Amino acid sequence: MKIAFNTLGCKLNYAETATYERGLMAAGWEVVPWTDVADVYLINTCAVTETAEKKSRNLIRRAHKTAPEARIVVTGCYAELRKEQLLALDGVWRVFGANEKSQIVNTLCHAERSEASVVTFGAYSSGEERTRAFLKVQDGCDNFCAYCTVPYARGRSRNIPICEVVKMARDIAAEGVKEVVLTGVNTGDFGRTSGESFLDLLKALNQVEGIERYRISSIEPNLITPEIVDWIASGTKFQRHFHIPLQSGSDRLLKRVGRRYDTALFASRIDYIRQAMERPGEPRVFFGIDVIVGLPGETEELFQETYTFLKERIRPAFIHVFPYSRRPGTRAAEWKDQVQDRIKTERVARLEALCEELHTAFVQAHKGLHETVLWESSQKEGRMGGYTGNYIRVERPFDAARVNQLEEIVL
């Protein structure tokens, strides 16, 4: 049987897709490009924005047009929130919600074609390419921020025990993968269901032989404790790379939407990490910051607070900018002071320009410094790429002998 995959949204979705891919390949399935004719198309959807939902529907229609007789399987956040809507689309065979994903591989391997139905989930490890793998350690969220559908789509915060995560990491290491990215909806909340701590997890993973690098895909600022920072800074496999959601640099907006920190706490966490991990003449910490533009009630003055906070106080290496999308069923969707789309677009452009300025400055500051690169297997126009420990992208002429190798270079 041939299967094609397409994934939208966050790294957690990509982690889960890679798990389905591994399971089906182990069962003898052939994975083909999305544009090929396949027996099954699996689409891992996103529902963070209206645009993401539209892209998911378009992918379903495209797959059905490419292979009208194929089975189309839909999972992800959109699948949890809009099951009946998806089942009504031509070609959709099954829809797997948030608590149903553990059945995907088994269902595809054993089920006969039948009427479309909603079937029900666990937690996984996963990987991509030959050099890097995503390892899912947590799922769900208990925060219920006013703008967000994720708690409804993925359920309450939960995790598997450390011993099971370590086993998956060892399996990944056995495949020769050298870098692992820890993923989750609220990764730092790990331990809620197992009575363990996120720091205990990091320490256990650090002992897995064969894995040379770890990254934490995203962690809430209030969950980055001094103990975690001090331990990472003490000389571990965890890299100087943090992806942290800010969402707004306005305390008024942070409080209104229900975030569990203010700008003072956020800045203090950034300061602590820098003080613990940065030294003169050494590579700096890469901070990737998430920001939502155009939250209800965001006046020009409040947007300027965000802009100034990022430019003058935080100065991250990268800003992930998202225009606010009004999601049905959330509190923020009912608020009357919605921001016009044209204003959101203009503010997104301003933050993207700031991102370009800050990222360029971050890279330039590393010229002449020594860093270690993990070279990737993909190539384009005779060149290969890789990332330094602090996530600077570098390239060189392709050399097959360097694939999946760590090499010290001068930037």
Question: Where are the language model's segments positioned?
Answer:
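Proteins enriched for Cys/Gly/acidic motifs involved in redox and nucleic-acid/cofactor modification
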Residues: 1-189, 203, 227, 242, ...
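Short strand-connecting beta-turns/loops that link adjacent beta-strands
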Residues: 36-37, 142, 247-249, 379-381, ...
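Conserved SAM/AdoMet-binding glycine-rich loop
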Residues: 72-73, 81-82, 174-301
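Glycine-enriched alpha-helix->loop->beta-strand junction motifs that scaffold or abut catalytic
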Residues: 91, 233-240, 313-317
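Glycine-centered loop/turn positions within well-structured domains
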Residues: 102, 143, 188, 222, ...
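Conserved, mostly hydrophobic/aromatic
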Residues: 145, 182, 216, 244, ...
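Short acidic, glycine/proline-rich loop/turn micro-motifs
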Residues: 254-257, 331-335
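Terminal RNA-binding accessory module
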Residues: 323, 334-411
